[in-house]
Regions:
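Conserved PLP-enzyme active-site core in the AAT-like
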Residues: 2-290, 294-302, 308-323, 327, ...
């Protein structure tokens, strides 16, 4: 039975597996000096901008840590939503590796706004205080909501006026682009993002991310920071070749659009049920909702999913590129049975 706990629980797309098998047929130079990585870099530059610098890394936490090290110095602070992955779910790795203070901002929907962050833009030049160095935003957010381009531009313009950078955690950026009908470039480069953690494991890849640097000022030390952060793979082609498959014939878009559609199908079946209340707009492939506790307890006997706020009986469902309509129908059938 399929899990609705996380898109990390999904499998690997067959076309990505084919790419891995092709990369495995012969020897190749290590550490990224291979034809597979060369092609992946070309595809990323084609999708984003010709002058970006992609660095392939092992995972999301490593990607965020590398990106934030490039954006900051140890006396800086990183401003993020209180639900941010770097603040809640990365065991303090970004704080430890950057030396920075992570400053969480209370938000109703997981999004930063200029109004919310302005109180944190203070004490510039005062030696007793951490100096604001970067905004960290997630696209999609940890609450499944999606930033519109104008919302991102408002943050990047504010940051740049204060000599700061903006790092986007794009673990689910494909779902956001699919939801908004935008290209990767329109959602990042054109909005003024300085550096992106470009993920794919939630959308059909096996492992790995790419730190994509857009701001030229951040490129010079990038390869050294990646190596020192233990994020340089010797057989790097097994990370990079997946991105070639991902960016060929819009595989990323097909996968993300499907996951989003499955979330909307689940939402349509749940919204009218007694005792069900949605806590956030369903804009991507994540659903946050409350149900009566007996319904949740019974459902947990058959399905794997997470509590988001156990005191409030709030749970999270996540759909994936390989979620089927039958999976949704079976889940809805079980919920209806327990709701009545």
């Amino acid at each position: 039975m399929r899990s609705f706990a996380s898109d990390n629980n999904s499998g690997v797309h067959p076309l990505v597996m084919e790419a891995l098998n092709r990369a495995n047929r012969d020897h190749a130079v290590g550490y990224g000096d291979d034809v597979w990585t060369e092609e992946a870099v070309r595809k990323i530059r084609e999708a984003f901008t010709p002058d970006c610098e992609p660095l392939f890394v092992f995972n999301g936490t490593g990607s965020n840590a590398v990106a934030l090290q490039l954006c900051t110095r140890p006396y800086n602070s990183v401003i993020c939503a209180e639900t941010a992955h770097i603040y809640v779910d990365e065991c303090g790795a970004p704080a430890r590796m950057t030396g920075c203070q992570i400053r969480p901002v209370a938000t109703p929907d997981g999004k930063l706004t200029p109004e919310l962050v302005r109180p944190y833009l203070c004490h510039f030049g005062e030696q007793h205080h951490s100096q604001p160095g970067a905004f960290y935003i997630s696209q999609c957010t940890e609450l499944g909501t999606v930033y519109r381009p104008d919302e991102i531009r408002a943050l990047t313009e504010l940051a740049h006026r204060h000599g700061m950078y903006v790092h986007m955690d794009g673990a689910r950026v494909a779902n956001a682009c699919a939801a908004l009908n935008l290209s990767f470039r329109q959602s990042t480069v054109d909005c003024g993002i300085d550096i992106l953690s470009f993920g794919g494991t939630k959308n059909g890849l096996m492992l790995g991310e790419s730190v994509i640097i857009f701001n030229p000022a951040l490129k010079k030390e990038a390869c050294f920071v990646r190596k020192q952060s233990a994020q340089l793979a010797s057989k790097l082609r097994y990370l990079s070749c997946q991105f070639t498959a991902y960016l060929t014939d819009d595989l990323w878009l097909k996968n993300a659009s499907h996951a989003n559609r499955m979330a909307q199908l689940l939402y349509a079946g749940l919204k009218e049920l007694p005792g069900v209340r949605f806590m956030q707009k369903v804009e991507s492939n994540q659903l946050f909702l409350t149900m009566p506790r007996p319904v949740i307890d019974n459902l947990l006997k058959d399905y794997f999913f997470y509590f988001w706020n156990e005191e409030e009986n709030e749970i999270r469902f996540v759909t994936s590129f390989d979620t089927t309509e039958q999976d949704i129908e079976e889940l809805l059938r079980a919920i209806r049975r327990y709701c009545h």
